Amino acid sequence: METATTLEIASCSQRQVEAAADPADAKGPRTSHQQEAGSPSLQLLPSIEEHPKIWLPRALKQTYIRKAGETVNLLIPIQGKPKPQTTWTHNGCALDSSRVSVRNGEHDSILFIREAQRTDSGCYQLCVQLGGLQATATINILVIEKPGPPQSIKLVDVWGANATLEWTPPQDTGNTALLGYTVQKADKKSGLWFTVLERYHRTSCVVSNLIVGNSYAFRVFAENQCGLSDTAPVTADLAHIQKAATVYKAKGFAQRDLSEAPKFTQPLADCTTVTGYDTQLFCCVRASPRPKIIWLKNKMDLQGNPKYRALSQLGICSLEIRKPSPFDGGIYTCKAINALGEASVDCRVDVKAPH
């Protein structure tokens, strides 16, 4: 508590009452009866047992802040005996009795506002007077409310996965300083709003890490001690996050030469067959470019002979001997030829009569 006292000390001295001017006064002393009849009573001020003081609560030494619509109820302890005279003023003027009520007690004074409004903000002064003495105290009350929305928001630029925004401050800050701005984004598909910046102090920003292929809208709220503004402006244009065109540059490389001369990886196998049963011979060859396959029997070319059917696919060479007879026995040769060379494999085929 702090004592706020302004003393004005009135000089209280007794005054001697002189008799009215009379010719008999100059001639001699007056009798006692004459003195009693001619002297008025002495006028004395009432005795002050306790000087007026105001004990201001510590919380009211700073600006007292309330939200619009809340109740203001201030109890200020005072002292003074006999009971002092208490008066309140608002910005130097008398209180509006339709909005503010005051109750003065023996030891306190109460200031009450049922629903505070911004017009109730200002300097309230309490004055306690007793005789020629007085004490004063000053209380600053600030009534605040939510700010208005920013006046506009504009999508300035979009590049890569980023978007640049600009906006202007609100016209009404709610009777107090702004704590900052809250920036939110929403993609066109879901329509859900997500906060990207809170209590941001500038009026422009860059929103990053946007998803490629989505289109975004943005909005900005203003914020003060009461909270966020009730509404927020939304960007008129959507930010389309385009997928960057990918440019492929083929790296130079030396082509491998896969050409090779024919080479048999699986040779022909000798076999014995029975007269009248079809027989097949197999071998595998590798070559590039594709080789020409020639089958020989006892070094005689079998091409065009209907008794034999030769096939070659994916490097697998086969020769079918249809219903062989003892005359079909002998040495069979498979020869592969291309531009890089040739190769050949042999096998012996024996044909026996059935038992």
Swiss-Prot record:
* Designated name of the protein: Myosin-binding protein H-like
Q: Which SMART domains would you find in this protein's record?
A: FN3, IG, IGc2
Q: Where is this region: Disordered?
A: 1-41
Q: Which cysteines are joined by disulfide bonds?
A: 283-334
Where in the sequence is Phosphoserine found?
Answer: 39
Cellular component aspect of the GO annotation = myofilament; sarcomere
Q: Report biased composition (Polar residues) as residue ranges.
A: 1-16, 31-41
Principal subcellular localisation of the protein? cytoplasm
Q: Where in the cell is it found?
A: Cytoplasm, Myofibril, Sarcomere
Gene symbol of the encoding locus:
Mybphl
Q: Which residues carry this modification: Omega-N-methylarginine?
A: 322
Query: What processes in GO biological process is this protein linked to?
Result: in utero embryonic development
Domain (Fibronectin type-III) ranges: 149-244
InterPro entries xrefs: FN3_dom, FN3_sf, Ig-like_dom, Ig-like_dom_sf, Ig-like_fold, Ig_I-set, Ig_sub, Ig_sub2
Report keywords, A-Z.
Cytoplasm, Disulfide bond, Immunoglobulin domain, Methylation, Phosphoprotein, Repeat
